[in-house]
């Protein structure tokens, strides 16, 4: 495949040279031009090198989205180092188990200072004026750095210890290019950084901005308020519903929304279209640096077709993908562990189908279970439950059963006031008997603290500890 990147320098340097006075970053205080952004990144990188940061090292970057966190990521990359953006809500016990395997050299903590408990040197974030530029000659040139490991993004997978997927700059730019070949995002447009940089979807926003040389907004204001001043955003359906309902009498600047994370009701996309907002849905993953397939949301369950530069195939029902945006591997104990591939095709472990001229994602292969001789795909049941207007998300967990082998249990989060008994009645006739959950539970807040995607394994562990199930097992002799 031909190289897509036209940059001879880092993207922010390129735009500082070609469009120095154009607005690059919208903040709570004042906008930054590309020239101002470049100067701030350069000063920060200088002070990082003065503290010992070198080419090839790794910096863990912990915190919520902020201007300082964004600049720290760019400055780290400018130094030729790898950046590991870290969710500040990950528990200390998990970090103690995970971080020693990721060969951390320095840490930056914009949250509560938890990283100070570990042994990593803390990088001070300083932007004092730099008078000499000779130090820049010691940094790796972009032509070299763009193919080297740049980011370690923890997989938001549903089970087990997160893996650190490694991407270089070219992979991120390839991913951005694929999305921007489909979505209209011009240099005068502004995309809200509405998703965290520790998640691949947040990185996707960042690299689309850098590739296009457009505007990025980082706001500390409430989401609904922040959305009223931008043209593009990445949201889940519940957030878009709230925006449309709370701004019925206002004119919105929002033009394009990339939706994910849940079933997308036709009523929502119709209402958005009436307000002048185009909605997009798709399919992506950490290992592919975000989006693989995308389409204009049309109320159908499919995810569309592969974006430019992406390939997708079905092998015995499994979705396999291939692209230049593919991760270099997983970083573990100082080594690059290979992805699970066949001739370059990444095995996603997702079940898929090609129906009515588009691809459909049916569910995870490892989620399938047998109940009374019937194959049960949890995502099929979850899709039905999620169609209820009060449901934000749901999980179907298999539990052992003496008669059926396994039975489904539903764990539900509501976006509006609703009772589990209401859902139980509403589901009657909408599911096959073997699909109907044997038990229903509300999703505990403690299970929602690890990022955008709730861990299915953690939900299962929690379910198995519930007194109702323990008593049921004792009565059945399991």
PLM-predicted stretches and their roles:
Residues 305-306, 315-344, 374-376:
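Conserved ATP/PPi-binding loop(s) of AMP-dependent carboxylate-activating enzymes
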Residues 323, 351-435:
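AMP-binding/adenylate-forming catalytic core of the ANL superfamily
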Residues 232-235, 243-300, 311:
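Gly/Ser/Thr-rich phosphate-binding loop
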Residues 173-190, 197-232, 237-238, 242, ...:
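Conserved AMP-binding/adenylation subdomain of ANL enzymes
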Residues 5, 20, 133-154, 160-161, ...:
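Conserved pre-ATP/AMP-binding loop-to-beta segment of ANL
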Residues 33-35, 142, 150-177:
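Conserved AMP-binding A3 loop
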Residues 369, 395-401, 409-413, 423-478:
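Conserved C-terminal "lid"/linker of ANL adenylate-forming enzymes
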Residues 46-90, 375:
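Conserved AMP-binding/adenylate-forming
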